Amino acid sequence: MELLKALLLLSGVLGALAEFCVIPKMDGQLVEKLGQRLLPWMDRLSSEQLNPSIYVGLRLSSMQAGTKENLYLHNLKLHYQQCLLRSTSSDDNSGCQTKISGGSLALYLLALRANCELLGSRKGDRMVSQLKWFLEDEKKAIGHHHEGHPHTSYYQYGLSILALCVHRKRVHDSVVGKLLYAVEHDYFTYQGHLSVDTEAMAGLAFTCLERFNFNSDLRPRITTAIETVREKILKAQAPEGYFGNIYSTPLALQMLMTSPGVGLGPACLKARKSLLLSLQDGAFQNPMMISQLLPVLNHKTYLNLISPDCQAPRVMLVPATEDPVHLSEVSVTLKVSSVLPPYERTVSVFAGASLEDVLNRARDLGEFTYGTQASLSGPYLTSVLGKEAGDREYWQLLRVPDTPLLQGIADYKPKNGETIELRLVKM
């Protein structure tokens, strides 16, 4: 009896200590500038550049793009439905210039839910089946004893479970079990660093399953995993306030905002401060990162797509006025040590040029080649000087001597005198 009283007292104390993660309102002009950066991307309607995350981010934000949103969703539907239905009916996929990945399809399902659409038609059922096939294929790649890895990533795996869940579609216990095992055994730590966005996506997926009481036989493990994810994210907070890095912070905050916990209040206020400084410095330029941050600034998460409010008032965005361009040159040195003979060359580009511009300039000068592949987060390197990234390898971008870049080649803008190394590393 005394033990029971002690446990009840302890649970009461912990309950009293639990806090919500609240992000106080930020300067409206900063938030508006963030939304304005998405507008040019909504004019890019080619199959390679369509990004469902842009639509989701805007719909969960406090801003809207008017008829542009409707046109963008229309083009998303044309692209995904035509490509997916063609790929399931035959091997002829010639009408689609890019292959639809599981993560991309999952984001498209989130976009439909952001428009208050629930999958129920024959086309919708085929898309659900396609995403479930993707998860089954990834489950097989992971292996019965978890000795393997997903063909894509655990991030896409968790995102796919989340997308099906917000559409009220169940997945098999064995599929959820793989993600649970990965969280329980620290599979999202690479080279000593936690992949915060992967951890957060898994946490969002588990929280959705818990709210619907899906996979009830796994309920105790799901509840424990949610707590584990929260604790890992909080431990990954840097002294500056961000979780992991500044670009993984939006998803981390989405996860932390879903339920109360001990110590969340101060941690989230600290994260807000780091985000504010980054926004003032213009750090968020990539549409994928912006679209993950906008919901947070509107006190929403992907879990709001369970019951979206499509009638909520949103402020109309207007295009930003362009600042005058002052042309000056900077010198950037490119270094590649992962090939023989090693490569090193200094090139000149206009100030404000991206790393991709630097690579193009080096290629134009001769003796340098590289290949890329498009993704929703922007192009990434697949080969440098003829050397292809192999299985479980990737080309890492570093600022010499040894600082990994947090942005991709299309987003990072080297400063004058910097040396950028392209290094082939194993995952």
Curated annotation (Swiss-Prot):
Cob(II)alamin binds at residues 152-156, 193-197, 245, 248, 292, 395-397. The keyword Zinc does not apply. GO terms for molecular function: cargo receptor ligand activity; cobalamin binding; metal ion binding. Keywords: Cobalt, Cobalt transport, Disulfide bond, Ion transport, Metal-binding, Secreted, Signal, Transport. Pfam families: Cobalamin_bind (PF01122), DUF4430 (PF14478). It is found in: Secreted. GO terms for cellular component: external side of plasma membrane; extracellular space. It comes from the Eukaryota. GO terms for biological process: cobalamin transport; cobalt ion transport. Its main location: secreted. Residues 1-18 form the signal peptide. Disulfide bonds join 21-268, 116-310, 165-208. Primary vitamin B12-binding and transport protein. Delivers cobalamin to cells. Interacts with CD320 (via LDL-receptor class A domains). PANTHER family: TRANSCOBALAMIN-1/GASTRIC INTRINSIC FACTOR (PTHR10559), TRANSCOBALAMIN-2 (PTHR10559:SF14). Belongs to the eukaryotic cobalamin transport proteins family. This is Transcobalamin-2. It comes from Rattus norvegicus (Rat). The gene is Tcn2.
